């Protein structure tokens, strides 16, 4: 009996070469449904429509095509099993040896933020995953292909084994198939969980669902944070960094991606690009080292913002990661070539900027559209031993109208503007975090110290004489008055912090004694 291949695909890429080779070189009978059968017939290949094979027409507008015992019996039957062979013969079922199925494009469909509930639901495949799982379960006898990228290697394996499909190949394909259907179901679950119609009820009923995310492999990385650690990058194809285009430069590393994420989060405080949900309000640039910003600035143009950000700490900026929140033009590109950098990310680059940056061949240049950011979701996920921690991103807009003046002296408008700028930055610095800023530029940043006054000392010393007349922001409350007193010694004129310490009055009293203004935000921004 000639072998049989069942082909039913949404993505027709590579379909004809695969079908022709199976039929013409290896003698496969071709069984197909719907649009796939039409493509094969138009190419002159002999194909049996599924409806003719089963004796049952497609019904419910195509919702039911392949859900039939003649299909699944042919896929699931164990060859050589007397009972199975008897059932096949009694029901006149033809064994199916190769199943080629890819699924309705659900993930691509829901990548459109405006997609309707009805259109999304109609792009949930039912028959396809059922056939894929049946074939994967019976991989001792059936090969299953779920992606056009598998076709060439499958045909190479067939040629190498004289037309037979080895057990090793079938097992590998079965693993791929189960991963494929798991990812598909996870995408459906995540989309439904994020729909406003299905947000958790007040009783918490929806929150007990498992947290699911199945992401395809984007690329294997050379190593992790250190050379002895293996690493890989998994990403949704068009969401977040999965939507980035690398325009030039060396391969991205684990540390590059971590630093890029930190730089992007920081620069988005000032808006990003055009056409997204949060367009740029003012040109801004950020320089990051080891996931901490070391220089941040706003200005009237991106070249000026870059100069000011780099001037914030040029020593630390060497070998850094830069994010720009708008189109990089030629002057900005020239500023970017003024010192060694690892990566730059921006929503767009002017052609003349690309020409200038091409002189730095190893510089990794990434273009990330605002639409990719909008498609990335709102979860912040970190791994712990044996599990995941999932929280909302800390990206709510600054709400300055809710701040209170705790000191006798209210900040001037210039001080208030600087305090707002510093407060936007401090939540992107590892705790304990202190930022010193003035005129839309960071002057000193203290990060990751085990006590707050230690971070303050680092930030103030880095600021040097620039601290005089500047402001200071803290991601957490002042547990004692030592930070305020140290700030005053360096010439700081105003401070901002969440408040909430049992000793708030000590710091407020110190501000009044020393002439500093203090704002309380009522919101903490720890970052671990």
UniProtKB/Swiss-Prot annotation:
EC number: 2.1.2.3, 3.5.4.10
Catalytically driven reaction(s): (6R)-10-formyltetrahydrofolate + 5-amino-1-(5-phospho-beta-D-ribosyl)imidazole-4-carboxamide = 5-formamido-1-(5-phospho-D-ribosyl)imidazole-4-carboxamide + (6S)-5,6,7,8-tetrahydrofolate; IMP + H2O = 5-formamido-1-(5-phospho-D-ribosyl)imidazole-4-carboxamide
Pathway this chain belongs to: Purine metabolism; IMP biosynthesis via de novo pathway; 5-formamido-1-(5-phospho-D-ribosyl)imidazole-4-carboxamide from 5-amino-1-(5-phospho-D-ribosyl)imidazole-4-carboxamide (10-formyl THF route): step 1/1; Purine metabolism; IMP biosynthesis via de novo pathway; IMP from 5-formamido-1-(5-phospho-D-ribosyl)imidazole-4-carboxamide: step 1/1
Domain of life: Bacteria
Keyword list, A-Z: Hydrolase, Multifunctional enzyme, Purine biosynthesis, Transferase
Domain MGS-like stretches: 1-146
Pfam families: AICARFT_IMPCHas, MGS
GO cellular component, as recorded: cytosol
Transferase found in the keyword field: yes
Description of its domains: The IMP cyclohydrolase activity resides in the N-terminal region.
Full protein name: Bifunctional purine biosynthesis protein PurH
Species annotation: Synechococcus sp. (strain WH7803)
């Amino acid at each position: 009996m000639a072998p049989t291949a069942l082909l039913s695909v949404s993505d027709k890429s590579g379909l004809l070469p695969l079908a022709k080779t199976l039929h013409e070189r290896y003698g496969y009978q071709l069984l197909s449904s719907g649009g796939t059968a039409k493509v094969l017939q138009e190419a002159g290949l002999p194909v049996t429509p599924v409806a003719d094979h089963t004796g049952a027409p497609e019904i419910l507008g195509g919702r039911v095509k392949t859900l039939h015992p003649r299909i699944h019996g042919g896929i699931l039957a164990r060859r050589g099993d007397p009972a199975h062979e008897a059932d096949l013969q009694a029901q006149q079922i033809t064994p199916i040896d190769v199943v080629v199925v890819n699924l309705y494009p659900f993930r691509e469909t829901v990548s459109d933020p405006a997609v309707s509930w009805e259109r999304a639901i109609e792009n949930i495949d039912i028959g396809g995953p059922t056939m894929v799982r049946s074939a994967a379960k019976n991989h001792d006898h059936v090969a299953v292909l779920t992606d056009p990228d598998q076709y060439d290697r499958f045909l190479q394996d067939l040629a190498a084994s004289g037309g037979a499909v080895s057990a090793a190949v079938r097992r590998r394909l079965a693993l791929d198939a189960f991963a494929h259907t798991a990812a598909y179901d996870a995408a459906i679950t995540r989309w439904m969980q994020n729909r406003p119609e299905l947000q958790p009820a007040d009783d918490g009923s929806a929150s007990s669902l498992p947290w699911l995310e199945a992401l395809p492999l984007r690329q294997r990385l050379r190593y992790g944070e250190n050379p002895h650690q293996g690493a890989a990058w998994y990403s949704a194809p068009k969401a977040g960094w999965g939507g980035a285009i690398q325009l030039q430069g060396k391969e991205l590393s684990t540390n590059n991606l971590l630093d890029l994420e930190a730089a992007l989060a920081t620069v988005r405080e000032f808006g990003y690009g055009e056409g997204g949900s949060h367009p740029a309000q003012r040109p801004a640039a950020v320089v990051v080292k080891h996931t901490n910003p070391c220089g941040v600035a706003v200005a009237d143009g991106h070249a000026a913002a870059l100069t000011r950000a780099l001037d914030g700490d040029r020593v630390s900026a060497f070998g850094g990661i830069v994010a720009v929140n708008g189109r990089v033009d030629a002057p900005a590109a020239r500023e970017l070539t003024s010192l060694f950098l690892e990566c730059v990310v921006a929503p767009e680059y002017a052609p003349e900027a690309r020409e200038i940056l091409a002189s730095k061949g190893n510089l990794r240049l990434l273009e990330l559209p605002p639409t990719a950011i909008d498609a990335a979701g709102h979860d912040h996920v970190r791994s712990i031993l044996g599990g995941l921690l999932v929280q909302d991103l800390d990206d709510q807009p600054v709400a300055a109208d809710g701040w209170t003046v705790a000191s006798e002296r209210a900040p001037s408008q210039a001080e208030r503007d600087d305090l707002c700028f510093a407060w936007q930055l401090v939540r992107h610095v590892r705790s304990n975090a202190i930022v010193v800023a003035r005129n839309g530029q960071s002057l000193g940043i203290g990060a990751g110290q085990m006590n707050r006054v230690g971070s303050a000392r680092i930030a103030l010393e880095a600021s040097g004489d620039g601290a005089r007349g500047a402001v200071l922001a803290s991601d957490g409350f002042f547990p004692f008055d030592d930070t305020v007193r140290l700030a005053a010694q360096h010439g700081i004129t105003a401070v901002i912090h969440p408040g909430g310490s049992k000793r708030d009055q000590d710091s407020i009293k110190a501000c009044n004694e020393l002439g500093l203004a203090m704002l309380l935000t009522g919101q903490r921004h720890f970052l671990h």
